[in-house]
């Protein structure tokens, strides 16, 4: 089961930018109560609790994306959006999956599948037993459809790829 879908900002590694990761959109499917208190909280407190959980996932995705880009040998200039006539390729975009232990930040263990495109992070929070191949294809399809709808993948409007392309000399 998918527990959440989120879109958030990604920053390039090695930049002086001290801005925080921002969640641009999130949708949580199902409710999870605060782990320390079985009694019912107000709707506002539950909303803030879910917001904190989603922000924790977004920060971990951003951290892993930056780590993957640095490990690939990308410099900060390689990760800046470039003006280009080439369409953005979703197959070259950084992606991955990681496991969240119970209590960090959800009560149950979860798997997070993520994709980084054009300084945006897309993530699905899943049950640990979900089919990751199917979930990855679904996430790529969602990202492509959203970016197509916003006209971010077309060469005329695109600000370029915000992910590292391997240098031939490396």
Swiss-Prot record:
Keywords: Cytoplasm, DNA damage, DNA repair, Endosome, Lysosome, Membrane, Protein transport, Transport. GO terms for cellular component: AP-5 adaptor complex; AP-type membrane coat adaptor complex; cytosol; late endosome; late endosome membrane; lysosomal membrane; lysosome. Disulfide bonds: none annotated. InterPro entries: AP-5_subunit_s1. It is a peripheral membrane protein. One of its GO terms (biological process) is endosomal transport. It comes from the Eukaryota. It is found in: Cytoplasm, Cytosol; Late endosome membrane; Lysosome membrane. Its main location: cytoplasm. Probably part of the adaptor protein complex 5 (AP-5) a tetramer composed of AP5B1, AP5M1, AP5S1 and AP5Z1. Interacts with ZFYVE26 and SPG11. As part of AP-5, a probable fifth adaptor protein complex it may be involved in endosomal transport. This is AP-5 complex subunit sigma-1. It comes from Mus musculus. The lineage of its organism: Eukaryota, Metazoa, Chordata, Craniata, Vertebrata. The gene is Ap5s1.
């Amino acid at each position: 089961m998918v527990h959440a879908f989120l879109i958030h900002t990604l920053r390039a590694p090695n930049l002086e930018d001290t801005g925080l990761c921002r969640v641009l959109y999130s949708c949580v499917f199902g409710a999870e109560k605060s782990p320390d208190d079985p009694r019912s909280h107000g709707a506002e407190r539950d909303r803030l609790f879910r917001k904190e959980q989603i922000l924790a996932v977004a920060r971990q995705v951003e951290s892993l994306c930056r780590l993957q880009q640095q490990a690939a040998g990308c410099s900060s200039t390689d990760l800046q959006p470039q003006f280009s006539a080439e369409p953005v390729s979703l197959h070259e975009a950084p992606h991955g999956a990681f496991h969240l232990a119970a209590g960090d930040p959800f009560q149950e263990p979860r798997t997070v599948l993520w994709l980084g495109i054009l300084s945006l992070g897309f993530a699905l929070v899943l049950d640990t037993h979900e089919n990751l191949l199917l979930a990855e294809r679904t996430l790529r399809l969602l990202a492509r459809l959203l970016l197509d709808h916003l006209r971010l993948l077309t060469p005329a409007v695109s600000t370029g790829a915000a992910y590292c392309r391997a240098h031939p000399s490396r």
